[in-house]
Amino acid sequence: KPYDVDDCRVRAEQGDAEAQFYLGVMYHNGQGVLQDYKKTVKWFRKSAEQGDAGAQFGLGLMYADGVGVVKDDEEAVKWYRKAAEQGLAKAQFNLGVMYANGQGVPQDDEEAVKWFRESAEQGSDEAQSELGRMYSNGRGVSQDYKEAVKWTRKSAEQGYHWGQNNLGWAYENGQGVVQDYKEAVKWYRLAVGQGNSFAQNNLGHAYDNGQGVVQDYKEAVKWYRLAAEQGDAEAQNNLGHEYANGQGVVQDYKEAVKWYRKSA
């Protein structure tokens, strides 16, 4: 609910956990006060220690990013866990990521899957996408392409660019679905609309090979270049290949070598 700063401060100093959280947010965003991350941490902590899930998650983020406090992954995990156990989907997702990457906790794919699933079942598009990826790669679960597609599709249909890219990949490769290049291109297009470099490279590949679209080397080069300029190594290699072969561009070995080098 909207508070004005003075009202919020009075309530926060009286120990109102919700007001403490909102005051922390105000300091974070510089709303009605000078932006001050240390004060954000101070008020998030007071609220979090009273059990406010939003503040626990916020404090976890501050520790994970090292903003207003010294970066500390173990502290981030501690606060994410408190919020996750209260059912906060964002915290469940972030806790899953920490387990998947072994940040602040020993790496544990099964724990990652557990938290991704909790978050995904609450509708988190990011968690649905990651859970799909875990099924696709057989990480923390038995590999199951159909289950991968189920979760990836939920994410994609919510408009999440990784879900869209990964669903396109499933259609391109016939993993968990009947292979369908046109359907792959449809999902890649949605993901490139959000600037996803993997999808840009994948769409370039579709044009390069005439899969789901009419073969068009110039279009291939366009999408490879967009991905390559974002640092995508595979796209850099593909762009080098186009220059080496004069496909969609004037043949230029120097340019080819330049992009091959970047990709190495």
Indicate where each model-derived feature is located.
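Canonical positions in the second alpha-helix
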Residues: 10-11, 46-47, 82-83, 118-119, ...
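N-terminal segments that cap or nucleate solenoid repeat domains
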Residues: 1-30
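Short helix-capping/linker turns of helical repeat alpha-solenoids
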Residues: 13-16, 29-31, 36, 49-52, ...
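TPR/TPR-like (Sel1-like) alpha-helical repeat modules
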Residues: 187, 223, 257-264
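Aromatic (phenylalanine/tyrosine) cluster motif
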Residues: 21-22, 44, 57, 80, ...
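Hydrophobic face of amphipathic alpha-helices that form TPR/SEL1-like repeat modules
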Residues: 22-29, 58-65, 94-101, 130-137, ...
